[in-house]
Amino acid sequence: MDIRIIIDGMKLNVRVGIMLIKDNKVLLHKNDNRDNYCLPGGGVHFLESSEEAIIREIKEETGLDIKVDECVSTIENLFEHDGIKFHEIYFIYKGTFVDDIDTNKIIENIEGKPIKYGFVDIDKIDDYYILPVVTKDIIKNKTSHIINREIK
């Protein structure tokens, strides 16, 4: 069960994402029902470390195995979505795929979700709408701990 707590109509989430980089390209995912891109990842379960969570999430969503190198950033992400205020703690890791992967192919979500994964050239990362918006700076190695306050 993911760490999601609702208090007074607001949500606390603990999430994890990973930068999987190969040939100066980073893997992003896009939900067919949304305009934005994100790093692949998901929710952290109760009594699960964030590192264990990212390994599990990538395996569940793509069937692929990854090796986690290090935690590169933590974002305190404060935002509103569909009228709900969120306080999200978001751990971002850097890692690699265990097996070789073709960066020119689209990876399908094996859980049946309307999500596709594809590699994006890091030099063209500014051409993409990525959430949280500070993710681009993390990909470009410019930040480590961020408070992303989109609401008051």
Name each model feature, range by range.
Residues 32-37, 108-152:
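Nudix hydrolase/Nudix homology domain
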Residues 44-67, 77-130:
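Unchanged
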